[in-house]
Design a protein with these regions (language model features):
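OB-fold and OB-like single-stranded nucleic-acid-recognition modules
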Residues: 1-158
Length: 158
């Protein structure tokens, strides 16, 4: 998450200034930064160029979706009772607000999931930083039918 925050915070700087900031990091941090540097995509590119579990920044205009069918899936939450651990399946729609992030040029959209407890995303052009995750329609699916961005940070673009 540190890399996402850093990349988003320096995103408005020109490449020269970005390089100066990155050069100030010690060697270990520079290696970590280069290894986990986010991929920057448009919503229209996310399905074809996105990589599952990769740090990603997507730019577009979010629109809160009310459709519960767009975001069918579950997250397994471990529950410990004494020495016994069981898992509870929680519907993703219960813990996330789901947005369609629209591409200005092609009007294509990509799903992003934003924590329900957080402030709503503005309906204006923003950069959303997070991790790409797979969205399986059911747990028996081998390959995910869709991807979504689990949003961690966002920044308005003027």
């Amino acid at each position: 998450q540190m890399i996402l925050f850093l990349e988003l915070s320096i995103s408005k700087l020109d490449n020269g200034k970005k390089n100066v900031i990155i050069s100030k990091l010690d060697e270990n941090l520079q290696e970590i930064y280069l290894k986990h540097k986010p991929i920057e995509l448009l919503p229209s590119e996310a399905d074809s160029k996105g990589i599952i579990a990769a740090n990603t920044i997507i730019t577009g205009i979010p629109k809160l979706t009310k459709s519960k069918t767009d975001f069918i899936g579950f997250i397994m939450i471990p529950i410990m009772i004494g020495n016994v651990t069981t898992f509870s399946l929680i519907p993703l729609i219960d813990i996330y607000d789901v947005y369609e992030l629209r591409d200005e040029k092609s009007s294509q959209s990509f799903l992003i999931a934003h924590s329900k407890g957080a402030n709503k995303l503005p309906e204006k052009k923003i950069k959303v930083a997070g991790v790409l995750k797979e969205l399986k329609a059911n747990k028996n699916e081998k390959k995910a039918s869709k991807m979504f961005l689990e949003a961690v940070y966002h920044m308005e673009i003027n």
